[in-house]
Regions:
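Membrane translocator/pore-forming domains, dominated by Gram-negative outer-membrane beta-barrels
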Residues: 3-205
Length: 205
């Protein structure tokens, strides 16, 4: 059994994607693209402590960067600092549950029609994920997963060359249902574990 074990970890990540909102414009008509692309990257480091083989708690911090670019022009670039904590439950029967919280302070620039405005704000949110993994006779491990996450964004007011405006704070939630797949290969020089996942994601605001 694991009792009183501690450790550190480090991870780097990068994401890139695009969206095509199902929306209409009330003031300019519904012509023209409303599609946009998103990208983000960052690095995080953390410290975890296992009370026993089932319960682990930890804290983490890191830096991140993101870009938002509409097809019709303009761009928003953000830099942020993040911190948070997590609790993980793994009883050893294939089930796991993970609850995490994070807070992000960010600032950046918005480019639009030749002007450059500064943005500043904070975001906080939590994620609850659980799953159950089982192994096939071939050695393939299949792990159905369920995850719910929510975030709240607090944006400071923006002043620009033609006046000023107040930004509405945003709240959003996401439900993810999916399954992970992995298989362990023991080699002379170590262990290789190829991993993949498929998910259905529903966003709420």
């Amino acid at each position: 059994d694991v009792k009183g074990a501690a450790g550190t970890w480090l991870r780097a990540y990068a994401n890139d994607g695009s969206m095509s909102p199902d929306a209409k414009r009330s003031n300019f008509g519904d012509v023209g693209s409303q599609d946009y692309s998103l990208s983000s990257s960052g690095i995080e480091a953390g410290f975890g402590y296992s009370f026993n083989s089932a319960w682990t708690v930890g804290v983490f911090g890191g830096i991140n960067q993101g870009d938002y670019k509409p097809d019709v022009g303009g761009k928003v670039s953000l830099d942020g600092n993040t911190w948070g904590g997590y609790v993980t439950f793994t009883p050893g029967n294939g089930f796991y549950a993970d609850l995490s919280y994070r807070d992000i302070g960010f600032d950046g620039d918005a480019l639009n029609n030749g002007s450059k405005e500064q943005l500043d704000g904070d975001a906080s949110g939590f994620s609850l994920e659980m799953g159950y993994g089982f192994k096939m006779q071939s050695g393939l491990e299949i792990e159905p997963q369920l995850q719910y996450s929510a975030v709240s964004v607090d944006l400071d007011n923006v002043a620009y060359t033609s006046g000023g405006f107040e930004l509405t704070d945003g709240d959003a939630a996401q439900l993810r249902i999916g399954s992970a797949f992995r298989k362990t290969f023991n080699q002379d020089n170590g262990v290789w574990v190829p991993y993949g996942a498929v998910s259905y994601i529903q966003n709420y605001d």
